[in-house]
């Protein structure tokens, strides 16, 4: 189904062409003065230069040409040459009736040529709990993935676990000091290794920071950890068995935490999965003449003539022959191309890694790891800060675990729900329903609070504001959906059947009704735009506008007491379309709505 803005542009363009002007001047846009009109076209301003006449002379001709067009209720030429447009309510109602026939799609077509897209997001480290710094990658990545799937693409999410390097050696060395009798440390052991891990997740989460602290103060311990890392990378059986245990225990816990965020991954691959591909990749870079030795390290030049700042070479191996993140990320691309042949790869990390990804992407293209036509995209996000403007911390100043943050917001939402219940004697929730509802609303508060900000910008994580039922918040959006559910339930309780998707939505009879209809008509454009720009904040902006329009319509319209049955059915059909679109959008953002609040 064509976007409404495109249909309007087609009519305006036709008028420009019929008056002898170039079609490029007929593009319509949303009005930047909604008090004057709904859409506008400024093409006459640009056309005036080419046709050497006053812009208002052109806009007057276009307005006259469109004056009897059934699409518009108002076409106005305004000096110095603007074209102001208002849609005919009948035409707008017809567009919405076409939208509601496509249940679940609402006029948003899937792409004609689906792509295979891999999204690299999450990026947790094994043996470490998720902390608030992991929130943005998970939440933004999940939404981008859902948007891509909704548009019809084959989208694969890969968590890309940090499970390689010195951290593994540190854990192995600390474990060896504590439990030297374990068979994993016996180089002569040739039997089967135990299937049960020799540690729990809580023990593992304590082992790593202890070992990390020791390595900074004890040179011998650090040396032993580096040796253990080397032996692991060379394939020592016992250490590889320990790595498997570390991964299994960590991944089980990570999955639980991500599930609480309503985030899931198609692939649970790690840096260790890329290691087998490194030797052949490095050899090919050397053979093809791309990699050379510089200050002992193996590098590939990635600078380009058009660079306005210096782009250093991409380091492939350190002087001691050890691999780096660059090496692992490039080798990861090797297996992704081999296994999935993607058309696009999207990476979500802190925006401070922009230069790093410029180097890696250029190296991947230059050395032929990925085809030239594969799109490599880095979404760099800003920092989540506390009210003091500094990175979010616990009250004690430490890094806050993500599950503790979610618990804190769950408790705040539960408190608010119980407070609200005091005024609802006949409709009180029991404890179980209240807790379940609090979790649903809390997740909306966290996710919407993050996603409503442009990804690249830092933002203040304000629990009081994010958990408010008023303003641009997740709970406000959910409140709007629950309000619609409540009206529909009351309508049914009076013996009425909910209208089917084919029920006619009538032309608007009030300004608030038309504003709601105009907001609904923007759905397909909002979703397409949000995915094309990998910008979930645009979905948030859209549903905030739609929720405001719905609530204004609700306050200005006697929906349940309307005496004209056709008009009332039209109102209900309008509410059902709004509910469907809001529920689709929040699913794309990664949360859901309760039945009541």
Which stretches of residues belong to each language-model region?
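Non-catalytic interaction-recognition regions
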Residues: 1-93, 104, 108-597
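Short, charged, solvent-exposed linker or helix-capping segments at domain edges/interfaces
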Residues: 94-99
